[in-house]
From Swiss-Prot:
One of its GO terms (biological process) is cell division. The keyword Cell cycle applies. The modification 2-(S-cysteinyl)pyruvic acid O-phosphothioketal is found at C126. This is UDP-N-acetylglucosamine 1-carboxyvinyltransferase. GO terms for cellular component: cytoplasm. It comes from Anaplasma marginale (strain Florida). Pathway: Cell wall biogenesis; peptidoglycan biosynthesis. The keyword Nucleotidyltransferase does not apply. Keywords: Cell cycle, Cell division, Cell shape, Cell wall biogenesis/degradation, Cytoplasm, Peptidoglycan synthesis, Pyruvate, Transferase. It comes from the Bacteria. The active site is at C126 (proton donor). UDP-N-acetyl-alpha-D-glucosamine binds at R102, D316, V338.
Length: 428
C-alpha cells in the first residue's frame, strides 16, 4: 500500500453516530488458511476488506486457489468471499508475500496436510516484539512432520499422513493452537491439544472446521480433542464480529465525550473490555441490534490493566486504552505480559503532550488537562488506532504518518469516523 497520512482536527465534535462492526480479522485470516484443506467452494460472509485479507488472498492464489470478492459497498464491512482450493499446485510461499503479514505462518499446517510438504518464508507484520514460531514448529513435529529452518524459510515435509498425538503447550499461543488444530483435523487417529488458546476467534475457526466435516470436541476450553477425518468439504460460514474494532470505536467515543452505536456486537462479545470501558467512565448498553457506548461520567477515570490471554485483557487493546488514559483524572498503569516492545506508541503520544513513561513491561500514564496536535508516526497497527484516538481528543491538528498500517486491521476507518462527526482526512 502507498504510504499515507491521516490529518485529524481534534476537539471539535464528540464522536456520535452508528457504525456497523466488521468481521474479525483475527478470525478471518485463520479461516481463510483453513480453506486450503477443503474440497469444493467455501462461501465466507462477514469478511473484512483489509490489507491482511488481501495478502492472504494473494497467498492462496499463489498456491493455485481461486478467490472472488463480493463487496458490501453500503456498509464498507462484512463482505462475502468465495474460495476454491480444489486445484492447488504449489507448496512454497515466497518472502514477498509472507513478509507483509505474520498470519502467513498459519498456512504451514494446511499446506503440509494438503500437499505433503510446505515451504513458508518467515512472516512479517507488525514489529511488536519477539513472536517466534517455536511452538508452531514443535506442534507439527509432534504430529510427525519433519521441520527445518533454512535461512529465512521454514520447510516442512511428511512421508505420509500426519499422526495424532498429545500436544501439551507450555504456554498459551493463539497461532500455535490454530496451526496444530488445522494440521490435526485430517491426521490419522486422535489428537489432544492441552493448554489450548480459548479466544473467540480460535473457537470460530474450530466451528468452521466442524461445519466442513471435522470432528472436534472441547471447543472453547483449554483441551481440544480432534479425531482425524479423510476429507473436508467447503461449507458456508459467517465470521464473528471484531471485538477489537468495536472496542476501538468505543474508546473514540469515551475520549471525545461522545456516544457511538455499534451494530452487530454485544457487551458479552466484548468480554472484559466492557467492564474496563465502564471503569474509565463509559456506559455500555445492549440494544436490539448491537450496543451503545457513551461517556457517562464528566471525567475519564484512570485504569490499571494487565494484558493476558483470553479471557484476560487483550494486548491488542492496550494502546487504545493508553491513548484514552492520557486525559484521565489520575495515573493509569498498563502492564504488558503477552508481547515485549509493545509501547512504541509512547514516544509519539509524548509529542502530543502526554505524560507517559515506560519501564520494562509497564507504562505509567499521568493524565493531563489537554493534548495538542502534532506530527506523529504510527509504528504498528494498534498504535495507529491509539494515535488516531489521541488526535480526535487533542486541541489542534494532528498528522499521523505511516498510517497505512491502520488498514491492516480497520476498514475505511476515517470514513466511518467522519460519518460520526470527526474531522479526519486521508492524505496519500
Amino acid at each position: 500500500m502507498v504510504e499515507a497520512s491521516l490529518r485529524v482536527s481534534g476537539s471539535t465534535n464528540p464522536i456520535s453516530g452508528r457504525i456497523v462492526a466488521n468481521g474479525a480479522k483475527n478470525s478471518a485470516l485463520p479461516i481463510m488458511a483453513a480453506c486450503l484443506l477443503l474440497n469444493g467452494s467455501v462461501v465466507l460472509a462477514g469478511m473484512p476488506d483489509l490489507r491482511d485479507v488481501t495478502v492472504m488472498s494473494e497467498l492462496i492464489t499463489s498456491l493455485g486457489g481461486r478467490i472472488s470478492f463480493l463487496r458490501n459497498t453500503k456498509e464498507k464491512a462484512n463482505h462475502k468471499v468465495e474460495i476454491n482450493c480444489d486445484n492447488l499446485h504449489n507448496w512454497a510461499i515466497p518472502h514477498e508475500i509472507t513478509s507483509q503479514m505474520r498470519a502467513s505462518c498459519l498456512t504451514l499446517g494446511p499446506i503440509l496436510t494438503r500437499m505433503g510438504r510446505a515451504e513458508v518464508a518467515l512472516p512479517g507484520g507488525c514489529s511488536i516484539g519477539s513472536r517466534p514460531l517455536d511452538m508452531h514448529i514443535w506442534a507439527l513435529q509432534k504430529l510427525g512432520a519433519k521441520v527445518e529452518v533454512c535461512g529465512n524459510y521454514v520447510k516442512c515435509s511428511s512421508s505420509g499422513k500426519l499422526v495424532g498425538c498429545h500436544i501439551d503447550f507450555q504456554s498459551v499461543s493463539v497461532g500455535a493452537t490454530e496451526n496444530a488444530l488445522m494440521a490435526a483435523v485430517m491426521a490419522h487417529g486422535t489428537t489432544t491439544i492441552s493448554n489450548a488458546a480459548i479466544e473467540p476467534e480460535v473457537a470460530d475457526l474450530a466451528h468452521f472446521l466442524v461445519k466442513a466435516g471435522a470432528q472436534i470436541s472441547g471447543i472453547g476450553t483449554r483441551t481440544l480433542q480432534i479425531c482425524g477425518v479423510q476429507q473436508l468439504s467447503g461449507p458456508s460460514h459467517t465470521i464473528i464480529r471484531d471485538r477489537m474494532e468495536a472496542g476501538t470505536y468505543a474508546l473514540a467515543a469515551i475520549s471525545t465525550g461522545g456516544s457511538v452505536h455499534i451494530a452487530g456486537v454485544t457487551s458479552e462479545m466484548l468480554g472484559c473490555l466492557a467492564h474496563e470501558l465502564e471503569g474509565m467512565g463509559g456506559k455500555v448498553t445492549d440494544v436490539p441490534d448491537g450496543l451503545v457506548v457513551l461517556r457517562h461520567s464528566p471525567q475519564i477515570n484512570p485504569v490499571v490493566l494487565h494484558t493476558a490471554p483470553y479471557p484476560g485483557f487483550p494486548s491488542d487493546m492496550q494502546a487504545q486504552f493508553a491513548a484514552t488514559a492520557c486525559l484521565a483524572r489520575g495515573t493509569s498503569q498498563i502492564h504488558e505480559h503477552v508481547f515485549d516492545r509493545r509501547f512504541s506508541y509512547a514516544r509519539e503520544l509524548a509529542k502530543m503532550g502526554a505524560d507517559i513513561h515506560v519501564q520494562g513491561n509497564t507504562a505509567s500514564i499521568r493524565g493531563v488537562d489537554k493534548l495538542h496536535g502534532a506530527s506523529v508516526q504510527a509504528p504498528d497497527l494498534r498504535a495507529s488506532a491509539a494515535l488516531l484516538i489521541a488526535g480526535l481528543s487533542a486541541q489542534g491538528v494532528t498528522t499521523i504518518s505511516n498510517v497505512q498500517t491502520l488498514y491492516r486491521g480497520y476498514e475505511a476507518m476515517e470514513e466511518k469516523l467522519r460519518a460520526c462527526g470527526a474531522e479526519v482526512e486521508l492524505v496519500r
